[in-house]
Amino acid sequence: MSKKLIALCACPMGLAHTFMAAQVLEEAAVEAGYEVKIETQGADGIQNRLTAQDIAEATIIIHSVAVTPEDNERFESRDVYEITLQDAIKNAAGIIKEIEEMIASEQQ
């Protein structure tokens, strides 16, 4: 089974931080061996929308947001790791590692 990380990034203005966080998360996830899909919710609306299949197949789901995302109910049946946009931008690789460690300890 392949590892899949999905994320949703959103901020009030949806201009810079949303896309900076998305880019850094994508780079860190690929480096960690994940298939990646990231939805952004910004000034230009929802881009790269996460589907029900994406959500069902995800190993890790991250919300890096500064606002409540649109269509947030899609994630109600899954564990979602919520982080700030600043944390994603500054330490995406470290956050992914922390989440992996939490998941591993829960499975023991």
Swiss-Prot record:
Gene symbol of the encoding locus: fryB
Taxonomy of the source species: Bacteria, Pseudomonadati, Pseudomonadota, Gammaproteobacteria, Enterobacterales
Organism: Shigella flexneri
Broad enzyme group: transferase
EC number: 2.7.1.202
Primary location group: cytoplasm
Boundaries of every PTS EIIB type-2 domain copy: 1-101
InterPro entries, sorted: Bacterial_PTS_Sugar_Transport, PTS_EIIB-like_sf, PTS_EIIB_2, PTS_EIIB_2/3, PTS_IIB_fruc
Protein name, as recorded: PTS system fructose-like EIIB component 1
PANTHER family found in the cross-reference section: FRUCTOSE-LIKE PERMEASE, FRUCTOSE-LIKE PTS SYSTEM EIIBC COMPONENT-RELATED
